[in-house]
Amino acid sequence: MGGILSSLNTSYTGLQAHQSMVDVTGNNISNASDEFYSRQRVIAKPQAAYMYGTKNVNMGVDVEAIERVHDEFVFARYTKANYENTYYDTEFSHLKEASAYFPDIDEASLFTDLQDYFNSWKELSKNAKDSAQKQALAQKTEALTHNIKDTRERLTTLQHKASEELKSVIKEVNSLGSQIAEINKRIKEVENNKSLKHANELRDKRDELEFHLRELLGGNVFKSSIKTHSLTDKDSADFDESYNLNIGHGFNIIDGSIFHPLVVKESENKGGLNQIYFQSDDFKLTNITDKLNQGKVGALLNVYNDGSNGTLKGKLQDYIDLLDSFARGLIESTNAIYAQSASHHIEGEPVEFNSDEAFKDTNYNIKNGSFDLIAYNTDGKEIARKTIAITPITTMNDIIQAINANTDDNQDNNTENDFDDYFTASFNNETKKFVIQPKNASQGLFVSMKDNGTNFMGALKLNPFFQGDDASNISLNKEYKKEPTAIRPWLAPINGNFDVANMMQQLQYDSVDFYNDKFDIKPMKISEFYQFLTGKINTDAEKSGRILDTKKSMLETIKKEQLSISQVSVDEEMVNLIKFQSGYAANAKVITAIDRMIDTLLGIK
């Protein structure tokens, strides 16, 4: 019903609406420094009109909703740009540290240690009897092996640091995820789509948690019923009815108000590095380590994972494997040469196979071919030679039988002056050692081996110069640590013979087999393989750094776009404040005028 009191109510709604606008503006200004606070706007519309006589009369203004200015599509791009930047920032920081362990070859490095090692053999070849040169060789060898082991230990330490960092990151992920699920529950309780009642502060808080969660983990967020709100802002797109955060291409860790935590467990490998499991409703664990390749978690896994449980290897594990291959190639090639130096007996390191296993079925790089066994008398004269063949089905039993067989190796129709008459071979399945020893030690005979492409001596570490299997345990034979003068630079026990020393210095120019798996052998020179290793590490770090620079630029660009939409502009809010204050004052003047009109009416007598 129309009338002067209705007019009073009309202006009163104007006062209330502008009061709300001033309140919202003040709230915007108060939160201007909060990056994740979305500026809010009051959506006002005329109240429903009614018929007054023959006229259609409006009765003031109604505050329909208070909505935040938020573009879900831009925010999604901003979040993605952020977790991509975080991925490469995390990766680069670790790869940069790893590359520092492998400086340029012209600086103090493993490469210079390697050169010093070969130069020591060269100096020894000039004077094979010089005890000082043997001591110098032992010192250079120990320096080389120490730096190889130290470099590997640094890589494994970096690997374990990244693994421990992952554990703390997953704890944070679980905390953020549970908070988001709780907020989803509260939003469901507070909001009403029909009445346009929005929990703006809860949504801002959820956006902030989601931003940081995806920074750590990546993934995709699925929201339904996203709508644009051009009345609020032309760039605004918000409101959803459901919320799911999916990671690993199929695992929902957040499903509305339900959160599925991630579990960290150590792998069964000796390194005990952490892997990630998804826990479903029935508490069943699924290994999703391989499926996480985004955010900080993805970067850490890509850096340190050791490949256990069928997962992919990380870059640090690749570097460790390459360093192990480098050490293994150096060990086997050196020992293959050193085993040719004549001694009173031959003894190998323990192996990991039984005497009835074919060499081809083991992981020992023993090839088809042959090797010669040579017996020398005390004057260094060759007195017997026997050739042993290795085929695809050869076992250690076959080798022992062939060596001990009573054959006429010298082909002089005398079966009592051949190799088997001076030396005997054995292999114990308990100690797993291959041994060749003299039948009569008092004769003082010498024995040596000459390889014809089998790598038998290098693979089994017969009379080794180097002990160990890879970069973790490579070392100078403990006998030569105690007594460097026992190093044998000769091939045959003859004064002035330094053939082994010559072959050792020549080794740096020869092709060597480098491998972790004997079915994937990389034949290279020792220096070439080291340069390949360092080149890969430095190239990976440089590539990651270049991508990081690109991702940073993209993040800054998208961040500016995001902030231009949602961030509070204090200048703009001050303009709005003046406008809303003027509107409030105008409505107040109308009320004052109506109040006087009422006084006039009441004063009529």
Set out the residue ranges of the language-model regions.
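Structural signature of extracellular appendage/secretion-system components
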Residues: M1-K605
